[in-house]
Amino acid sequence: MTLEYIYIFIFFWGAFFISCLLIFLSYFLVYQESDIEKNSAYECGFQPFEDTRSKFNVRYYLIAILFMIFDLEIMYLFPWSISISTGSFFGVWAIFLFLIILTVGFIYEWQKGALEWD
């Protein structure tokens, strides 16, 4: 291993060791006994009026996935835009094909009604 990467190696293993140590300590040092106050009603002393688990519409998850897809698109476009001056013609066509695939996917989602909130 060259000396250029030794600091990254040390940082990685140090972070790994510290996180494992904290997880290990949290399991053994925490007070895990449940008492009456923790299991009692929480809505101003009354019994709960409804189930605490609220149901989310599936469309929220769909919008979150679409956001992640287009967020990843931006993540790929920023490095490409910085390296465009040193890139070749192949790089331009590769990103053009990437954008076309994403655009076709977006049009497909739009026509299937994935973006409609009926």
Swiss-Prot record:
Pfam family, one: Oxidored_q4
Membrane spanning stretches: 5-25, 62-82, 87-107
Gene3D superfamilies: NADH:ubiquinone/plastoquinone oxidoreductase, chain 3
Location relative to the cell: Mitochondrion membrane
The protein's Enzyme Commission number: 7.1.1.2
Keywords linked to the UniProt accession: Electron transport, Membrane, Mitochondrion, NAD, Respiratory chain, Translocase, Transmembrane, Transmembrane helix, Transport, Ubiquinone
Keyword Transport found: yes
GO cellular component: mitochondrial membrane; NADH dehydrogenase complex
Family: Belongs to the complex I subunit 3 family.
Task of the protein: Core subunit of the mitochondrial membrane respiratory chain NADH dehydrogenase (Complex I) that is believed to belong to the minimal assembly required for catalysis. Complex I functions in the transfer of electrons from NADH to the respiratory chain. The immediate electron acceptor for the enzyme is believed to be ubiquinone.
Membrane topology per record: Multi-pass membrane protein
Enzyme class: translocase
InterPro entries, per database record: NAD(P)H_OxRDtase_bac/plastid, NADH_UbQ/plastoQ_OxRdtase_su3, NDAH_ubi_oxred_su3_sf
A molecular function (GO) term: NADH dehydrogenase (ubiquinone) activity
The protein, known as: NADH-ubiquinone oxidoreductase chain 3
Catalytic activity as recorded in UniProt: a ubiquinone + NADH + 5 H(+)(in) = a ubiquinol + NAD(+) + 4 H(+)(out)
